[in-house]
């Protein structure tokens, strides 16, 4: 027997629960399906547990630096990994349970646990239950890519999910992948006391960023004793006495990296391969992402895709914004579009990188004339007071429209300070209006007006 609903939401990640709330408030009868843990990647294996680990690692780092601030410890810093893991697990469990309780107590919402599979464009099966609805919303997230590398099937390896279960500090952690996830874990475990090597296939770390940002990130990590190998074109694995042998050169006989543990952090893939999307006629791109239009509708009327599975943004905040876009178009008569989104994001190493808008390379690729200004964090009083002076700020602007095109803040508080620029871009505020702002002293953000005053023409060549 088929159960009929006004809407079906598949997945309880960042977009699904909030959308369910809006739909039920509007009077709809909604079925929400979750096959695993409530809260999605962010709550369970992403932002929340990892940033809890970042905080623990920062505490260890600051304790070791205590003498720099006149604080002398009587004994070396000791890492209690069981306590570290327990703390992260508690934060995760509380958040996940909060989402689950919210949904289960939501009037008009029926929660079903199990794997969803399409039977047609209006029908979804969950175990023995067959559901139907004129509106279906897919919010199934993604998972770590396991690359096809020689020897990988002969060794044990970690992903961003399984590494959260460790209750020990690896002797030597080899991180495959030099982008956001890999670098955050690299610094975390280095600060916990592990030897760490980062192996990146590309020519630089955080490959989407400008070379000056990439070089500064590398310098920060190498100062902490993290080994970095870029342009590793021939990565292969074998078992070794310590645990694993990792080769990175194409020439046989080249020195190997001897590690105890391997973390794979080479990217993410969408969880779309077991949904039966073909039975609904839903189109995918070559990488398995669900293709959507500007309002996040798929090629099938009445079906939407939100969050990591649509390939239009791989962040918690973009997934939540997907919910806002769908709700605005469907319920509020507000024609919001994905392309209107001003994308900001952060790399949560210490010091963090806050980013918004275009990189300098992207501006040049478009052949745009632009203004540029850069200032080191040594010019920021707050950074000097904290003795955390690594990094710099950079801003790019259009000389004719006076719009800010993009910015990078790599330094203490950069993940927070970048929001002033993000908001200005979103509000289309000309940069010359920000020049005369009177920011609070002492803060990281107070250098932004000075940064804007320093804008000078740059070549687009």
Model segments located where?
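Glycine-rich dinucleotide-binding loop and its adjacent helix/turn
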Residues: 47, 140-195, 199, 227, ...
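Catalytic nucleophile loop
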Residues: 16, 179-182, 319
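FAD-site-proximal beta/loop scaffold in flavoenzymes
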Residues: 153-170, 256-332
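Conserved beta-strand elements of the Class I
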Residues: 6-8, 31, 174, 304
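Short hydrophobic core segments
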Residues: 8-10, 116, 131-141, 175-176, ...
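Flexible, glycine-rich terminal cap/loop adjacent to redox cofactors
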Residues: 10-36, 41, 48, 52-59, ...
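A Rossmann-like FAD-binding core segment of flavoenzymes
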Residues: 74, 110-113, 117-125, 193-294, ...
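Glycine-rich flavin
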Residues: 2-5, 14, 22-28, 33-169, ...
């Amino acid at each position: 027997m088929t159960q009929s609903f006004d809407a079906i939401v598949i997945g309880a990640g960042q977009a699904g629960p909030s959308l369910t709330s809006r739909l039920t408030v509007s009077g709809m009868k909604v079925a929400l399906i979750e096959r695993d843990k409530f809260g999605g990647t962010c709550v369970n294996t992403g932002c929340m547990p990892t940033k809890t680990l970042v905080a623990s690692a920062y505490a260890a780092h600051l304790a070791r630096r205590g003498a720099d601030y006149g604080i002398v410890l009587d004994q070396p810093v000791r890492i209690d990994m069981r306590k570290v893991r327990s703390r992260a697990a508690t934060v995760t469990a509380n958040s996940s349970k909060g989402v689950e309780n919210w949904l289960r107590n939501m009037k008009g919402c029926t929660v079903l646990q199990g794997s969803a599979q399409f039977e047609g464009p209006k029908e979804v099966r969950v175990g023995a239950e067959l559901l139907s609805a004129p509106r279906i919303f897919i919010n199934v997230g993604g998972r770590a890519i396991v690359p096809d590398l020689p020897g990988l099937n002969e060794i044990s390896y970690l992903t961003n999910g399984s590494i959260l279960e460790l209750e020990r500090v690896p002797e030597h952690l080899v991180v495959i992948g030099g982008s956001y996830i890999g670098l955050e874990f690299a610094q975390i475990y280095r600060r916990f006391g592990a030897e760490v090597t980062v192996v990146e296939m590309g020519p630089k770390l955080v490959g989407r960023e400008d070379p000056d940002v990439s070089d500064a990130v590398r310098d920060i990590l190498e100062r902490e004793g993290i080994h970095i190998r870029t342009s590793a074109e021939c990565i292969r694995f074998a078992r070794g006495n310590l645990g694993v042998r990792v080769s990175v050169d194409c020439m046989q006989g080249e020195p190997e990296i001897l590690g105890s543990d391997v973390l794979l952090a080479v990217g993410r893939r969408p969880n779309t391969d077991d949904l039966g999307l073909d039975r609904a006629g839903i189109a995918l791109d070559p990488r398995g992402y669900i293709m959507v239009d500007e309002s996040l509708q798929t090629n099938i009327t009445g079906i939407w895709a939100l969050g990591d599975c649509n390939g239009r943004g791989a962040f918690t905040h973009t997934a939540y914004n997907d919910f806002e876009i769908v709700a605005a178009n469907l319920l509020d008569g507000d024609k919001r579009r994905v392309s209107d989104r001003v994308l900001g994001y952060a790399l949560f190493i210490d010091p963090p990188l806050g980013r918004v808008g275009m990189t300098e390379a992207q501006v040049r690729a478009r052949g745009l004339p632009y203004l540029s200004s850069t200032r080191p964090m040594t010019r920021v009083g707050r950074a000097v007071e904290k003795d955390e002076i690594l990094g710099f700020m950079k801003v790019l602007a259009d000389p004719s429209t006076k719009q800010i095109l993009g910015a990078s803040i790599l330094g203490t508080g950069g993940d927070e300070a970048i929001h002033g620029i993000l908001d200005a871009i979103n509000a289309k505020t000309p940069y010359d209006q920000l020049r005369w702002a009177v920011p609070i002293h002492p803060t990281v953000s107070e250098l932004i007006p000075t940064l804007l005053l320093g804008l000078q023409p740059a070549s687009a060549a």
